[in-house]
Amino acid sequence: MENFYNISPDYNTFMNIVITGASKGFGRAIAEIYAAHGHHLFICSRNEIALYKTVEELLTRYPDTKIKAKARDLSRKEEVADFAEWLLANAYHIDVLVNNAGRFIPGSILNEADGALEEMLHTNLYSAYQLTRLLLPSMIKRKSGHIFNMCSIASLNAYPNGGAYSISKFALYGFSKNLREELKPYQIKVTSVLPGAAYTDSWSGSNIDPKRIMEAGDIAAMVYTASQLSPQACVEDIILRPQLGDL
């Protein structure tokens, strides 16, 4: 795992990195790799205790990095607006935005709870859509920035019991692809990240062999590397699957 952070030198020094859903899973892994390279982090999670524990642990490991955090539930439009206002007041500019806030609730379309689709859309789609819209004017003004939208293999392939979750991830991928086309004239990059199964806290207590699926750090390494390319290069899609294929 130590070699995970030994990636080529940064093209940009001390970038401002915004990561939602940063207290665990992919968001935590992405926060860690940027912290390891000394970038400035602005992170968010709905769980205040887990969020500030993440800040404490990252600062202990990487004392030279700067981290600011704000606990907000981005499934709520008013809290998205509050988080965006805080970001614009605290970050001189935003170099990388990682829209990672999300939630997974399994269930078939027929049998899932009433309101499941609305909940998945608010968390997995609207949070990214609304936050991006609020931050884009400052990015467009600078003609610079990179937006990562954390989609899923479920954005590409339907599967039994995917239900509202898969629908929301298909929608997020559509948002990301449209955003990519709209922002080309402004030199703002957009990357859709579509990972398969990776071992995170959501798998703890399950019978899955961690070696059967990916590590969260694999996804973080790809995101970080994509953000380090020359200004004239944009990775549009990052698709990662376990070596043995999907579960």
Task: Name what the model sees in each region.
Residues S23-G25:
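Conserved glycine-rich cofactor-binding loop
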Residues H37-K53:
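Conserved glycine-rich Rossmann-like NAD(P)H-binding loop of the short-chain dehydrogenase/reductase
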Residues E48-I49, A71-D82, D114:
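The beta1-alpha1 cofactor-binding region of Rossmann-like NAD(H)/NADP(H)-dependent oxidoreductases
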Residues S108-I109, A116-L121:
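Substrate-binding pocket helix/loop in short-chain dehydrogenase/reductase
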Residues T132, S168:
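Active-site helix of classical SDR
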Residues S152:
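Residue(s) in the substrate-gating loop at a strand-loop-helix junction
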Residues P185-I188, S192, I208-L247:
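C-terminal helical subdomain
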